[in-house]
């Protein structure tokens, strides 16, 4: 494969900034700007008989660097979120594979914005934010994949696993010989699971976490936290446990009658609204509504004239 500028391995190969971290001899983490935190994400580079790039949210400059040093043969998206697909346009003549669930709208910023926001004004704000923060440009997919698809790059093979909840089109990829699970936005971050879109579902998210756990991975690679090799079961417990923590917080807040607007102003899921406040408030409301529906179904909350109140004190 020749000289490898930018690969950060135990041998200490030199490049500044170091943007590639070896996971296996053929798989590398392409570090995202801002340490992979939103609005960026880490990407995955496969260098085998086929060179493939998974997700393009690491930053436009890093993609241009990659294009010069390790030009991919194809691009794959894990799901249609704007911090995972904004740089698809950097590779205009390559095959672009996306989940079958989002093939019809991936790469079209007008369609994605409307799907993720539900109002014309919020859609406009979303487009403005995404273009400014990520460098997003439209780039249409050429093909799609589904649950159980096997990507074969040579000696490296990845199995696509549909893991909805975060979005309807969220996938994980498994490298079966080494037990590596690429979980993308099931990211094991301290914030916990995110499910703020109309097609996001808490129950699906919990089921997807259990699907990952059942793989018994020896390593997890996430889009925002990078490589995780220690205490994987415990990390999954803590991450998934945030859902129950949020519901306890909601129940504590509903010790007296509260309106939905009071809950949004809390806020009870986001700690605050540090940017794009209208969008964050919208997603806070969506996530609160999903929790309230679950709590209503369980008889833990009841509707009132003004909003909601809990029916019993939450368990510790």
Each model region followed by its residue ranges:
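C-terminal regulatory/interaction regions
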Residues: 4, 249-316
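Metallo-beta-lactamase
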Residues: 8-25, 51, 58, 103-247
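Conserved beta-strand hairpin/beta-sheet module of binuclear metal-dependent hydrolase folds
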Residues: 15-67, 172-186
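Active-site HxH/HxHxD metal-binding segment of metal-dependent hydrolases
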Residues: 34, 39, 58-152
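Short glycine/proline-enriched coil/turn segments at helix->beta-strand junctions
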Residues: 48-50, 68-73, 89-95, 176-179, ...
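Conserved S/T- and glycine-rich ATP-binding loop of Class I adenylate-forming
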Residues: 78, 163, 295
């Amino acid at each position: 494969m020749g000289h490898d500028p930018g690969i950060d391995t135990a041998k200490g190969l030199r490049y500044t900034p170091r943007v590639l971290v070896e996971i296996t001899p053929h798989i590398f983490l392409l570090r995202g700007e801002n340490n992979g935190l939103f609005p960026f994400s880490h990407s995955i580079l496969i260098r085998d008989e086929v060179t493939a790039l998974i997700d393009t949210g690491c930053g436009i400059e890093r993609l241009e660097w990659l294009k010069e040093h390790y030009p991919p043969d194809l691009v794959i998206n894990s799901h249609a979120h704007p911090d995972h697909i904004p740089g698809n346009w950097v590779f205009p003549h390559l095959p672009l594979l996306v989940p079958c669930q989002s093939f019809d709208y991936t790469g079209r910023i007008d369609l994605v914005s409307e799907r993720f926001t539900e109002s014309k004004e919020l859609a406009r704000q979303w487009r403005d934010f995404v273009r400014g923060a990520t460098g997003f440009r439209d780039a249409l997919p050429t093909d799609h994949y589904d649950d159980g698809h096997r990507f074969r790059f040579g000696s490296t093979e990845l199995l696509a696993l549909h893991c909805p909840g975060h979005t309807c089109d969220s996938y994980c990829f498994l490298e079966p010989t080494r037990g590596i699970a690429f979980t993308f936005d099931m990211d094991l971050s301290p914030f916990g699971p995110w499910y703020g879109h109309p097609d996001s579902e808490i129950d699906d998210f919990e089921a997807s976490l259990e699907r990952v756990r059942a793989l018994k991975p020896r390593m997890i690679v996430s889009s925002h936290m990078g490589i995780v090799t220690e205490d994987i079961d415990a990390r999954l417990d803590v991450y998934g446990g945030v859902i129950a923590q949020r519901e306890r917080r909601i129940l504590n807040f509903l010790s007296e009658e509260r309106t939905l607007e009071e809950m949004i102003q809390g806020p009870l899921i986001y700690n605050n609204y540090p940017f794009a406040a209208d969008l964050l408030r919208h997603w806070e409301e969506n996530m609160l509504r999903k929790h309230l529906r679950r709590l209503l179904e369980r008889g833990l909350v009841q509707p009132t004239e003004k909003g909601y109140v809990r029916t019993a004190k939450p368990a510790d």
